[in-house]
Amino acid sequence: RKTSGSSVDIDADLRNAILTDIKINAKSILKNVKGILVGGDIAFAGQKKEYDFAREFLKEMTEQLGIDEKNVYCVPGNHDVNQALIKKSDSILNAQSKIEEAKTIDEADHTFGKYITDEACPDLLYKPISEYNDFAVSYGCNIDQNRIVWTEEFSLDNNMKLKLLGMNSCIISSHRDHDGRDEQDARKMVIGQNQIPSYEENVVWVLI
């Protein structure tokens, strides 16, 4: 939340309850814990101080579970988007609109591809999540025009492998997500075909 870590923090009890639950229950019930998955909305408004606070909380969680901090895996959500930046940038808004207005997923992928290979500003669509990326890089979960998803591989029994894939569901997310819309008519996310992994024998994919 926006108030996390402030004098009016209303979620402190919830965070303490999570840590207590890990200490008393999770450590005795869960065996061989390999990591923590964070499915987006790490921040409230994509601001650095929010990520600093989140990093400290995740550090406490990893310490309780006895795992390394590098074993945190995260993806961005719409609250990880710096909407204040987008409001000031016609360039970002126009790029997002072009993708959203595509008639087919192939057209959306083509438009997205044009923007991330633009020699003048290939990171345009990733500027709104720059603070997320600064936070996520320490976990190996940063994404940009050169790496639009991240993957991590784990070995399982019987020659099987588990692969995590971190998706980006907020490519076109902005302050317009809920403009004049109710929950039934919320703005649709765009997840391109280039984020969908190909079939691999003896591999189980988990998309986050």
Locate predicted features.
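Structural beta-sheet core signal
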Residues: 38, 74, 206-208
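Amphipathic alpha-helical scaffolding segments
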Residues: 52-60, 90-97, 183-186
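Generic detection of long, well-ordered alpha-helical segments
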Residues: 48-51, 122-125, 186
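Active-site glycine-centered loops adjacent to acidic/histidine catalytic or metal-binding residues
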Residues: 40-41, 77, 167
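Active-site neighborhood of divalent metal-dependent phosphoester bond hydrolases
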Residues: 65-146
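N-terminal active-site segment of His-dependent metallophosphoesterases
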Residues: 1-72, 82-86, 194-200
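His/acidic metal-ligating clusters that form di-metal
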Residues: 26-32, 146-208
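A generic short-segment signal for beta-strand/edge and adjacent turn/coil regions
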Residues: 3-7, 40-45, 117-136, 176-178
